[in-house]
């Protein structure tokens, strides 16, 4: 499948975005992902927030012209199995993407990505990361039933593959608006470090309490780089997704999208 018509360089970020990126990190206590039903209703300004335990909360808003929530669900179902598709999203930072499960036979977009593990390699700032992104049912983030025609929520747990440590949670909450949709992206970094190995997990629990050590790995720079990365990839996605979805995302063209 030829994707060349959808490939384009990143556009410069708007003045409002660069203003948000220039803000200092704000000291603030925040709720964990299980309270997402409350969090998405709050008027939280874009930026980076840090609590007293050196955990981070990142908020990023993207206005997506002519993009509807169902297109976002389709995008996550469609792009995950293929590195070239993944690179469309951020042509500079995204390197590779693969799945170990094949759900291409399913026609419901949510069923094609919820419950799977996506293995990606990408840059966040100058940091090269190998990550496993485990997509979860929004109910696990405390979100109730969503009307696919009005809203959607992409929820995931992120594991660093070099260490096996679960380091972050993410939520992309998308709602219809007058121009298309509004995406509110939230990231929680370091608030609940976990490992599948019980011994290592016990160490992580102790390690997390030593805040200055935790700050050596999860810090202001990483959080601010993540904010910039999210602004770039989501604004870029909005620039080509309407045309991509029109060409291959509709039900009449489903076979071509696999």
Predicted regions mapped to residue ranges:
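Beta-strand-rich recognition/accessory modules
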Residues: 150-162, 170, 182-190
């Amino acid at each position: 499948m030829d994707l060349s018509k959808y490939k384009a360089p990143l556009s410069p970020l708007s003045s409002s975005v660069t203003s948000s990126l220039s803000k200092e990190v704000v000291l603030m206590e925040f709720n964990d992902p299980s309270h997402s039903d409350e969090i998405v209703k709050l008027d939280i300004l874009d930026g980076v927030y840090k609590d007293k335990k050196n955990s981070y909360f990142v908020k990023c808003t993207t206005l997506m012209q002519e993009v509807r929530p169902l297109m976002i669900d389709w995008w996550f179902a469609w792009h995950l199995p293929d590195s070239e598709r993944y690179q469309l999203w951020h042509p500079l930072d995204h390197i590779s993407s693969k799945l170990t499960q094949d759900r291409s036979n399913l026609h419901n977009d949510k069923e094609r990505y919820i419950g799977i593990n996506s293995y990606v390699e990408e840059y966040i700032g100058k940091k090269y990361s190998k990550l496993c992104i485990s997509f979860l049912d929004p109910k696990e983030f405390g979100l109730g039933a969503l009307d696919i025609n009005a809203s959607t929520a992409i929820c995931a747990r992120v594991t660093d593959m070099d260490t096996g440590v679960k380091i972050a949670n993410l939520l992309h909450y998308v709602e219809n608006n007058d121009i298309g949709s509004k995406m509110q992206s939230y990231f929680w970094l370091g608030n609940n470090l976990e490992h599948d190995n019980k011994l290592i997990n016990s160490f992580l629990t102790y390690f997390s309490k030593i805040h200055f050590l935790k700050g050596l790995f999860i810090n202001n720079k990483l959080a601010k780089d993540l904010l910039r990365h999210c602004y770039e990839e989501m604004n870029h996605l909005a620039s080509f997704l309407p045309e991509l979805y029109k060409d291959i995302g509709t039900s009449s063209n489903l076979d071509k999208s696999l």
